[in-house]
Structure formats: C-alpha cells, structure tokens
A protein has these predicted regions:
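Short, solvent-exposed loop/turn and secondary-structure capping segments
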Residues: 61, 69-70, 88, 117-118, ...
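N-terminal secretory signal peptides that target proteins for export/translocation
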Residues: 1-7
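Boundary at the C-terminal end of the N-terminal hydrophobic targeting segment
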Residues: 25-28
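Conserved beta-strand hairpin/beta-sheet module of binuclear metal-dependent hydrolase folds
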Residues: 45-96, 216-219, 223-228
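Bacterial N-terminal signal peptides
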Residues: 8-22
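Active-site metal-binding motif and surrounding structural segment of the metallo-beta-lactamase
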Residues: 43-44, 51, 72-74, 84-128, ...
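Metallo-beta-lactamase
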Residues: 32, 50, 74-75, 82-84, 101, 137-206, ...
Length: 302
C-alpha cells in the first residue's frame, strides 16, 4: 500500500528543514567569529620584543604598547599605557634591558591608553615630553561621564572574563595604579619636527587619522616606523561606537600614504605586535590603505 503525504505536510517539513539548516549555518558562522576573536588574543601575548638594534616593544601589559628606543646615554619612550600599574610592570622589564635615564617621552596622540603611565618611566632626570600641539587642546587623560560609560560598553568591561577574551586592540583596559599623565613640554604645529635625543635621530610626522592630533615617529637610521594608532592588526577604527569626534578618513588615507612613502623596514604599532621586513611592512600598510579607501569610496557612492 502506497502512503501519500499531504502537500501541506511536505511544505511544513521543507520549511522546517531549511530553517534548521539556516540555524546550523548561523551557529557555524557565530562560532567562527568567536574562534577568530579568541585566536586574536595571540596578538597580545605578554612579551618584550626586540624589533631591531636598540628598539623594543612591550606588548600585552596594557591596552596599548610601550616602545623603548635605546640611545648612547639615555632612553626614549613612546606611549605609556593607560595606568601606572601596567606602566610600572613595563618599566621593570625595560630595566632588564637598560637602566639609562629616560631622556624623552613621545605621545603619538591623546587617547588615555597612551598617556596615563608616564610618571612610571621618570627617574632622577625629568624627560622632555613631545606631542603635536593639537594634543594640548584635545587631551582628556581621564574619561568621564557618557564617554567613560560608552567606552566601557565598547570594550565590554561589564562582561565576565570568559566572554571577553580581549579588547580587539589589546588584552584589556587596565586603569589600575592611578594616573601618571605628564603634560607635553615640547610641541610642534607644522607637518614634521626633527630632533635628536641620546644620539638617536627622530622625525615626528603630523598624521591625522584615528585622532586629529595623531603623529607618527620615524627613526631614519633604523628604518623603523611607529605609526601610533593609524595602523594595527585589526580593522581600522574609522568611527568608535562609544561616540567620538568625526574622524576624517580622507586625512587618514593621506597619512597612510605618507608612511608608505618612507619605505620602512620595521613597523611598530602602538597596538598589536610589530611587523619586520620591508616586504611584509609594505604589504601591511598598502593593504590597510586599500581597505580604508574602499570603505570611503563605497560610502561616498552610496
């Protein structure tokens, strides 16, 4: 005897099967994204990495990296983390490399995770602190009110640790130990500013992008570029969901072009791990430029 299935039951079964397939596909996609996020934590394994002769970067101690450049009779520090607790830990690691006095500190920009640990690196010698002059107008070393609340939401600070493997650009935001911010003592207002500290030649280039006060640090004798937050191994933060002043993406592209033109051999961002080798650095910067450009062009095209 042949059993005939009513058409409406066939339709119901088909819809249910397709729905189940859709759920399974969505779940697979969800898990793939989760797995990528957990794997991204490898970017923030705590380490002090020697990039090239006299250049080191401390990764994974705080949301932002700290970069050390050793000179003849002193040290240069670039960016100082978001709090004195993490900065002291970095200082202890750097002391294993050199106990020369810190002669200068450079802020790549005004975000709190780059400026609040400065006092941890000061010894008997009071260092000069370099920044672009716009930082004096824009710097907010502590986040308050809505900015602080929404910033916490952006980084998932209220989530349990198992649901927050990293903050995307660092292991997490660590504000412990207090605020050690130091006001810049030397600023520049043009496109570039060159100086020498402890025998190391330094060029600061004005590079608006993630912030309007952003600069990059170029060490010409070492062919080493420190791009600040205009490059890291994550999609560029063209507009932060916490709410921030407008970020001029066209200016960001110009800044990336300026950095590419330097033809650096070493790239040491203030978030995520460094990139070594001329070919790898060029591929990273040009790929970043292409991605940002694509977003801009497609947005303008509607």
């Amino acid at each position: 005897m042949r059993f005939v299935v009513p058409p409406h039951l066939v339709s119901t079964a088909l819809v249910s099967a397709l729905a189940l397939i859709g759920v399974e596909a969505a779940s697979a996609q969800e898990f793939a994204g989760r797995d990528k996020l957990f794997a991204h934590s490898n970017e923030f394994l705590r380490d002090v990495i020697q990039v090239t002769d006299g250049v080191y970067v401390a990764v994974g101690f705080a949301l932002a990296n700290v970069i050390l450049v050793e000179g003849d009779d002193g040290l240069l520090i670039i960016d100082t983390t978001e709090g004195m607790g993490a900065a002291r830990e970095v200082r202890a690691e750097f002391d294993r490399i050199s106990t020369k006095p810190v002669r200068a500190i450079i802020y790549t920009h005004s975000h709190p995770d780059h400026v609040r640990g400065s006092r941890a690196f000061v010894g008997d010698v009071e260092p000069e602190v370099y920044a672009h002059e716009k930082q004096l107008r824009e710097n907010l070393p502590t986040a308050v009110g809505r900015a602080g609340r929404d910033g916490g939401n952006q980084f998932g600070l209220a989530l349990p640790a198992e649901s927050r493997p990293n903050a995307g650009i660092g292991p997490g935001l660590g504000l412990g130990g207090g605020d050690g911010y130091m006001r810049p003592t030397r600023t520049f207002s043009g496109e570039s500013y060159s100086f020498e500290v402890a025998g190391v030649k330094v060029v600061l280039g004005y590079a608006p992008g993630e912030t309007d006060d952003q600069l990059f640090v170029w060490l010409p004798e070492k062919r080493t570029l420190l791009p600040g937050d205009n490059f890291y191994r994550a999609f560029p933060n063209l507009y932060a969901i916490r709410g921030v002043p407008l970020r001029r993406v066209d200016h960001w592209l110009e800044s990336l072009s300026d950095m590419i033109a330097l033809e650096p051999e070493y790239l040491v961002p203030s978030h995520t791990r460094p990139i070594m080798g001329r070919t790898a650095v060029d591929a990273a910067l040009t790929g970043y430029h292409a991605g940002v450009s694509s977003v801009l062009q497609q947005t303008l095209a509607g």
